[in-house]
Amino acid sequence: RFGDIHVAASSKDENFTYIPRKFDIRPDAQYLHICTNNTIFGTRYNFLPKTDVPIVADMSSEILSRVINVSDYAVIYAGAQKNVAPAGVTIVIARKDLVDDKDNQLSCCPTMLKWSVQAANKSLYNTPPCFSMYVAMLVFRHLKKIGGVKAMEEINNKKAALLYDFIDNSKLFKNYVRKEDRSIMNVPFVTGNAELDAKFVKEATEHGLCTLKGHKLVGGMRASIYNAMPVEGIKA
């Protein structure tokens, strides 16, 4: 409905356990869309594809988790529900020329999803989700207090290193994602036995380690260690 989609790269050949390095970008492409962190398979982009095409990034599951160069992107958008606030708020960082380019806006795009409309109304075109925005403010203040996104990234790297090190040295658990492409937000792991996985999830829950069941598409286990998860939670 909104465009002619072409898949420029995929790691389906290895069950999405790595980030592809080769991209087949069509000459007529208007932008390249990437999801920088995959919550289901536990991968993330540690590089940007080399292209002259504007890059649009979905950072819903990792925004504010690490330092990025915003100017590398034409558009960054993110739902707030992972690292910022309760669901209801969406953050959009877009180049001004794209926001102002009314001539190339799709006529089929709903009015409230048009960035030019939202920008002209200072994000108040419709009644905003006030509580979610209030919580976002508190989160932003907290981040500034602890030293900003750089400090948060250091904490997240420490958390992820602790968990991956345990899994890699375990005789029971395994993570199949290539090390250079591992997410620091979502860590999937398995025993290799579905019944044992289910038993682990059940007994972990009984011991206060909750929501470790893997996504329904892949099974196994998954530890989502977003910004709100303290280092102590990993050590537990």
Q: Language model features by range: what are they?
A:
Residues 1-3:
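Membrane helical hairpin/interfacial module
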Residues 172-176, 208-214:
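A short linear hydrophobic-aromatic micro-motif
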